[in-house]
A protein has these predicted regions:
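Catalytic His-Asp segment of secreted/periplasmic serine-dependent ester chemistry enzymes
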Residues: 96-205, 209, 220, 229-231
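Ser/Thr/Pro-rich low-complexity tandem-repeat tracts
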Residues: 217, 222-228, 233-239
Length: 239
């Protein structure tokens, strides 16, 4: 569903990927390169101005503490930074669960604990935290808003929720200077492991533009001044 909102030139998504496997899971294909590349390798090739990382749902487990999750996730993010030091890091909140969901081992309490750990992780490392959960959550129940998760599993976001999420992304920004070096040729992103792209993919000429960072709202949240590499890249996972 993410490719209804982003260009395939600036988004990566892989089924079942986790924050813990961010540095090591090879899932991205590029024209002219054999096999799959890891997220850090992909970011280095795509040379984005910023990345928005959305991981955590696939990490949820009663035996995996919030602090351990954040520690493992941070290692993956640092691998992305090491691969392309000029990139701005934006960590998106884990989306809320539905009040009724198919995997009863997952709890909204744990989602909230993981998100609190992500806030601290970002503060400790100078990264930006995008609190998109606030637009997806029903403040009266603490769960996802009605109609925001699929009725089939109560976990994955609906089109209505994705509309709200991407509106939130576009309207929360904090402008930073583009410090990337001169960009080299960016290879064509041709596929992601276990992901099929439907017919509604957004073209590269109409791609959504993410915020510079996510500390404060700004009326002019769009900036399409990138030349060569994508202005942003979204790394996301799906269960």
């Amino acid at each position: 569903r993410i490719f209804n909102y982003c260009s395939y030139d600036n988004a990566i998504g892989s089924v079942g990927m986790s924050g813990k496997s961010l540095a090591t899971y090879a899932c991205v294909q590029f024209q002219g390169y054999s096999g799959y590349k890891t997220m850090p390798e992909a970011v280095a090739l795509m040379q984005p101005r910023r990345v928005i990382l959305t991981f955590g749902t696939n990490d949820l487990s009663s035996s995996y503490s919030a602090s351990s999750f954040a520690s493992d996730y941070a290692k993956g993010i640092k691998a992305v930074q090491d691969a392309y030091p000029s990139v701005d890091i934006i960590v998106n909140a884990i989306p809320p669960l539905g009040q009724q969901h198919s995997n009863q081992n997952l709890t909204q309490t744990q989602v909230d604990e993981y998100n609190k750990a992500l806030v601290q992780m970002c503060q400790d490392n100078g990264w930006k935290f995008l609190n998109s959960a606030e637009v997806l959550k029903d403040s009266s129940t603490g769960y996802a808003k009605s109609g925001y998760v699929l009725s089939s599993d109560g976990i994955h976001l609906t089109e209505q929720a994705m509309d709200a999420l991407f509106t939130y992304i576009r309207t929360h920004s904090y402008i930073t200077e583009d410090t990337r070096p001169a960009l080299t040729a960016v290879p064509t992103h041709t596929g992601d492991k276990d992901v099929s792209v439907g017919g509604n993919i957004v073209s590269s000429t109409t791609a959504a533009i993410a915020p510079e960072t996510t500390e404060a709202p700004d009326e002019d949240a769009s900036d399409s001044s990138s030349s060569g590499g994508p202005d942003w890249a979204d790394g996301t996972s799906g269960s």
